[in-house]
Design a protein with these regions (language model features):
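Domain-level signal for soluble alpha/beta catalytic cores
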Residues: 1-187
Length: 187
C-alpha cells in the first residue's frame, strides 16, 4: 500500500500536525522508508506499491506520484512496481478514473514496472502509452476476476496482443485483474 492510499483511508485526528492528505501522506512516506530499509537490508530487491485510490480522485495522482518518488529515491538498485486499479472490492469496480486522466502523474513516476488493469476497463488502457513513453515493464491484467468461469486462450490472447504495440515480449507480464481475493472459493 502506498502513502496516498494510507492517507486517504486514515481518520486524521491530528489536523494540527497533518492539515491535509498531502501532509499525512508525507508522514506515512517517512514511516514506509524506515520499514523498507529493513527489508532491503535483508535482501529485498523488488517492491510493489498499490495506489488504487488514484482512480477515485485523479487530481490527487500527481502529488501521490511525487511522494512515491521521494520513497523510491531512497533505494537505488531496488526495482519498484506500481499497481493502479479501480478498487475492485467484492468483484465490482469502485473507482472510474481513466489512466489518461492521470498522465501528469505517470510521466513523473520513477518506477521499473507498472501493473494496470486491462481486460475489464470501460476504455482502452493502452491509450496511456500514446502519451507516456514508459521504458519499463508492464504487468497487464488479462484475466477477468469478475466472471465465474475460465476464460478461453483466445480471449486471453485477444487481451494480450495489443500490448505488443508498446512493449517487447520480455517486458510483458500477464496477470489477473485486481480483486481476485474476492472470488468465491468454489470457483
Amino acid at each position: 500500500t502506498g502513502p496516498h492510499m494510507l492517507a486517504r483511508f486514515s481518520v486524521n485526528e491530528r489536523t494540527d500536525l497533518y492539515p491535509d492528505d498531502i501532509a499525512l501522506a508525507k508522514a506515512y512516506a517517512k514511516v514506509l522508508i524506515e520499514e523498507l530499509k529493513q527489508v532491503v537490508n535483508e535482501g529485498c530487491t523488488y517492491i510493489q506499491f498499490d495506489e488504487p485510490v488514484w482512480t477515485e480522485n485523479v487530481k490527487e495522482a500527481k502529488w501521490g506520484a511525487e511522494i512515491l518518488n521521494e520513497i523510491i529515491s531512497q533505494f537505488p538498485g531496488v526495482k519498484f512496481n506500481l499497481h493502479i486499479c479501480g478498487g475492485n472490492a467484492h468483484r465490482k469496480r469502485g473507482y472510474f478514473g481513466r489512466y489518461t486522466d492521470m498522465i501528469d502523474a505517470f510521466k513523473i513516476l520513477n518506477i521499473d514496472e507498472i501493473h494496470l488493469e486491462h481486460c475489464s476497463l470501460h476504455y482502452t488502457m493502452l491509450d496511456i502509452f500514446k502519451e507516456w513513453n514508459f521504458q519499463g515493464s508492464i504487468s497487464a491484467g488479462v484475466i477477468d476476476q469478475r466472471i465465474d468461469g475460465t476464460e478461453t486462450i483466445e480471449k486471453v490472447v485477444k487481451h494480450t496482443e495489443p500490448l505488443l504495440e508498446y512493449f517487447t515480449p520480455n517486458k510483458i507480464l500477464l496477470t489477473s485483474e485486481c480483486g481476485f481475493g474476492h472470488v468465491p472459493i468454489e470457483i
